[in-house]
Design a protein with these regions (language model features):
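Alpha-helical scaffold segments that form or flank carboxylate-/histidine-based iron centers
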Residues: 18-29, 48-66, 108, 132-146, ...
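A contiguous pocket-lining binding segment that forms or flanks enzyme active sites
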Residues: 130-186
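Alpha-helical transition-metal enzyme core signature, strongest for iron centers
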Residues: 29-37, 60-75, 109-119, 141-152, ...
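Active-site-proximal alpha-helical scaffolds that flank and shape metal-associated catalytic sites
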Residues: 80-150
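Acidic/His metal-coordination segments adjacent to aromatic residues that form catalytic metal sites
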Residues: 7-29, 88-112, 129, 162-163, ...
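Helix-loop segments that flank and shape redox-cofactor active sites
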Residues: 14-18, 36-59, 119-134
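Extended, helix-rich structural scaffolds rather than catalytic motifs
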Residues: 167-238
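Conserved alpha-helical segments that form or flank metal/cofactor-binding pockets of metalloenzymes
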Residues: 54-55, 59-87, 155-159
Length: 238
């Protein structure tokens, strides 16, 4: 198990596998950060029910863009240009959760509640990771991501409490996004995640992180008076 800390100036001397895995993980993370605003900003921002909601949507999108910039800067410092993801269509995104569009507030709220929560899990993998420049940018990013999750959770609760029709719409959104959230963790039998762990770039296997997410989010869904969706039906990666 690799336990050293790697600074930018030392990266060229690292094993090619380490550099390849680092390149992959920052590229996917950059795509995830930009993917969210591409999904919802066009339709959700102008349809916000209140000025406060509109402000919070705008701030969320702005912070996600800044997260992309921070990740892109880390990548650029070691010669990797991730700017190509800026011009990708949604259907070209690395992860299924960022393909398509979001044009209802039920979907937007549940996206924040679930998908941004997975984003927090993804970022937590890098806490104390072997590549120091990546660790260094995490505190503010994770703090803001927690805010996005909190807003999504509060809006989900608000919409679920508005009446039967609204609760049914929230449940339908939950059914759509829950399996996408679980799939974001990747395959349980992945061999690549073992290499990430070996090189100190991640702390948990895909299966471990997914189970921790389930243990956290399922009770929250129940507290909202909603039904926990089937964790298998519709999944792409088990």
């Amino acid at each position: 198990m690799f336990r050293e800390k790697v600074e930018l100036k030392e990266l060229e001397q690292m094993d090619p596998e380490y550099r390849d895995l680092l390149t992959r993980v920052v590229t996917i993370q950059a795509d995830c950060e930009i993917g969210g605003p591409h999904l919802y900003a066009k339709d959700i921002l102008p349809s916000a029910p209140t000025k406060t909601d509109q402000l919070l949507v705008a701030r969320t999108a702005s912070e996600e863009l800044d997260h992309y910039r921070k990740i892109a800067r880390v990548a650029g410092d070691f010669g990797v240009d991730v700017s190509f993801v800026l011009s990708w269509t949604n259907q070209e995104r690395y992860l299924e959760a960022f393909r398509g569009t979001i044009n209802t507030w039920e979907d937007f709220a549940v996206f924040g509640f679930l998908i941004d929560r997975v984003g927090r899990y993804q970022l937590e993998e890098f806490f104390g990771c072997s590549y120091q420049p990546l660790t260094d940018i995490l505190p503010i990013i994770i703090k803001e991501e927690i805010g996005h999750v909190g807003y999504g959770e509060s809006k989900t609760a608000e919409l679920a409490a508005k009446g039967e029709e609204s609760r049914e719409k929230v449940q339908a959104a939950l059914d759509r996004w829950y399996v996408k959230a679980l799939d974001m963790f990747g395959r349980s039998d992945s061999t690549r995640d073992q290499r990430y762990i070996y090189w100190g770039l991640k702390r948990r296997t895909n299966a471990q992180a997914r189970q921790e997410f389930i243990r956290e989010v399922d009770p929250l869904i129940g507290k909202l008076g909603l039904r926990v969706p089937d964790p298998i039906q519709g999944r792409q990666y088990l």
